[in-house]
Amino acid sequence: MIENLELIRAQSATRAAGCDFMLLSSLHNVTYVSGFEVPVPVGAGAETAYGPSLVLCATHDAHNASWLIVSAANATAAKAQSRLAETLVFGTFDSFNPLDSRAQFLEQLLAIFKAAGLRNATVSLGIESRTTPHAVLELLTREFPYIRVINIDDALAQARSIKTPREIALLRRAAHIGDIGQRTLAELVQQAGRTEFEMWAELTSRMYAAVGHEIPVSGELVTGPRTCVVNYPAGPRVRTTQPGDAALMDISQRVDGYWSDCTNTHVIGGVEPTAHQKKFAHASQAAFDAALETLRPGKLASEVWQAANAAYEKHGIQMPHYMGHQIGAVVNELPRLVPYDHTPIQAGMVFAVEPGAYEGEGGTFGARSEKNILITESGPEVLSDFEWGI
């Protein structure tokens, strides 16, 4: 079995939290430890499956005591991708015979708990407080009264904080796919007259083609006056672009379980940006540069925010929102670049740095400048390779 550094880190963190076993239920943590890219839960496959994909794992044994539990709809992909010892499947739906998905899910889970030796033992089980199904907690209470349940949300977040070499490679690829989207937008904005929908369709299509299949994509593509405020969800819409309009795209995409998050701002139609537009775009870029210079091992997340804020002040613009966040199997994870987060920056972290500058309600322009940054021992490395639009 290939060494699974992500699983080892999760085991170490949850073992330190006092756990003998961990039961993972969130999309990102199951993906993180198993290597199976758990699908975003939409569509018939998600609706017919009673429970989510789960991982049960002993905190002391990486090879013989790890199970991935998935629905029948996900079985083929899970068995191909999983790096855990066993992959077990529960039924969801049958077109010709009744099938109780709830019973299938809980029976499979009960069998795995027994195989792990939980029935006759006093053990501590770490769970995720936000995503563990109530039916699973009922099963634990009824069948395993001696189990002590521990919340491991913080332990898992800490385990994921420093990226492994495998994760860094995946984040590089995700950033490359983000570059394709941003470069396509830079091409499309050279001519006015397209709708936001048309541009979004073209650039996401090119991203899909580069990956080889459809991928989860979220974010916004806004043009004209809608760029002057931050108002999620904000696009795309049917609006037809005009020469001189701003175009701002903040796009996130998940590739092989890992995210990119990048933003750029343009002026549409080959029109030279006005001095007013340059003021906001250059303030955003100056804040990005200040944050980038400060993102070094030993600095604090709050110090990155302070450096960016000083850049805003030099441009006479008030900081409108946070400066960014870590990124990985979660699109927006800790630490975040805010004045109250004093987490030390460490090599192996990957950030999405995203300062913006907006004219505000009633205005016509706003800009945001976001790229993905790997922290190395010698300083920051910019993973995103597209050029600023202004």
For each feature predicted by the language model, list its residue ranges.
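Active-site neighborhoods and metal-handling regions in enzymes and metal-associated proteins
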Residues: 1-390
